[in-house]
């Protein structure tokens, strides 16, 4: 059982206190319904060695270490392999390098310099396995709550959390839509790699705004295309072999949408083309990756002939 009472205690006296009181029952209900692979993933978690880190680095990396023998490292590696595929990372856990599909540290290095997270209550929407949540704590956040309905990501988060004493990070295996309206309790909300999966992008922006305190900050990272304020790509069918991609606006269009949704001080802090070095298959993620989704003759296009993935980071205030 996952005990959320520390979360409820931590949020006493904040605008999130009432919501936090009901989270344990909500989580228990989700756990009861479960997932067909949960027992297998739980077995992998149970197989992790019982050790404590003497070194923890969440600021410059995601690294935990201590003196341990080769047998312990082998046990760690086997258990973590039982939680494949690993998509966001990398993680350096007691001598085991979890070489994830994404070099998420590269993205974080593009985002973090533009933020002051010290003492902030943070919501990470579509948090995946929690890689960025740990990096947010490393940057000084007071607390981080991540929501993502993917059970494997939830288990991967638990694998790291068990080695950190009283971390102020909590992964809730809920969709964003399960959060109550008008929470207005977070200082910063992140939506990274989520926006283009939304059928109603403006509704998503409004929902994100509703989670923020007045003056709070949104960090939005999403796929974009070149063009002016009226340029938006809506794929006919698939985009880079993904069926669930809906709207890819230009940066000026996205900034306009944010202003229309009531955000202010809207600024673009980074635009980067995703490379096959940043997203690729590894022994920890053996399925197809970006190189399989691009035109083999021209990496500036997807297999469908659309512009290859380019991502922007937009920061805005409520």
From Swiss-Prot:
PANTHER family assigned to the protein according to its UniProt record, in alphabetical order: METHYLTRANSFERASE, TRNA U34 CARBOXYMETHYLTRANSFERASE
Reactions this protein catalyses: carboxy-S-adenosyl-L-methionine + 5-hydroxyuridine(34) in tRNA = 5-carboxymethoxyuridine(34) in tRNA + S-adenosyl-L-homocysteine + H(+)
Cross-referenced NCBIfam families: PRK15068.1, tRNA 5-methoxyuridine(34)/uridine 5-oxyacetic acid(34) synthase CmoB
EC number: 2.5.1.-
Quaternary organization: Homotetramer.
Family matches, as InterPro entries: CmoB, Mo5U34_MeTrfas-like, SAM-dependent_MTases_sf
Gene Ontology MF, one: transferase activity, transferring alkyl or aryl (other than methyl) groups
Gene3D superfamilies noted in UniProt: Vaccinia Virus protein VP39
Full protein name: tRNA U34 carboxymethyltransferase
UniProt binding sites for carboxy-S-adenosyl-L-methionine: 88, 102, 107, 126, 192, 196, 311
Function noted in UniProt: Catalyzes carboxymethyl transfer from carboxy-S-adenosyl-L-methionine (Cx-SAM) to 5-hydroxyuridine (ho5U) to form 5-carboxymethoxyuridine (cmo5U) at position 34 in tRNAs.
Annotated gene: cmoB
Family classification: Belongs to the class I-like SAM-binding methyltransferase superfamily. CmoB family.
Biological process annotations from GO: tRNA wobble uridine modification
Database matches in CDD domains: AdoMet_MTases (cd02440)
The species this protein was found in: Pseudomonas fluorescens (strain SBW25)
Keyword line: Transferase, tRNA processing
Superkingdom field: Bacteria
């Amino acid at each position: 059982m996952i005990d959320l009472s520390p979360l409820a205690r931590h949020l006493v006296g904040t605008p999130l206190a009432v919501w936090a009181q009901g989270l344990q029952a909500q989580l228990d209900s989700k756990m009861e319904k479960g997932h067909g692979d949960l027992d297998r993933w739980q077995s992998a978690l149970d197989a992790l060695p019982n050790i404590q880190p003497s070194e923890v680095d969440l600021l410059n990396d995601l690294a935990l270490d201590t003196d341990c023998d080769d047998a312990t490292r082998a046990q760690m590696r086997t258990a973590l392999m039982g939680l494949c595929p690993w998509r966001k990372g990398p993680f350096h856990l007691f001598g085991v390098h979890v070489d994830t599909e994404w070099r998420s540290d590269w993205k974080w290095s593009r985002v973090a310099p533009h933020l002051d997270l010290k003492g902030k209550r943070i919501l990470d929407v579509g948090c995946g396995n929690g890689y960025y949540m740990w990096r947010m704590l490393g940057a000084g956040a007071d607390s981080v709550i991540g929501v993502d309905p993917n059970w494997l990501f939830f288990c991967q988060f638990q694998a790291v959390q068990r080695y950190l004493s009283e971390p102020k990070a909590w992964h809730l295996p809920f969709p964003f839509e399960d959060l109550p309206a008008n929470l207005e309790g977070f200082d910063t909300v992140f939506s990274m790699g989520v926006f283009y999966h939304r059928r109603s992008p403006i509704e998503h922006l409004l929902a994100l705004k509703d989670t923020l305190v007045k003056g709070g900050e949104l960090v939005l990272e999403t796929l974009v295309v070149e063009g002016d304020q009226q340029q938006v790509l809506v794929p006919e069918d698939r985009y880079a072999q993904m069926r669930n991609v809906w709207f890819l606006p230009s940066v000026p269009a996205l900034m306009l949408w944010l202003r229309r949704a009531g955000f202010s001080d809207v600024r673009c802090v980074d635009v980067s083309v995703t490379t096959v070095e940043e997203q690729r298959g590894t022994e920890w993620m053996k399925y197809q990756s970006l190189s399989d989704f691009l035109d083999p003759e021209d990496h500036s296009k997807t297999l469908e002939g659309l512009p290859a993935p380019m991502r922007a980071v937009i920061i805005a205030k409520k």
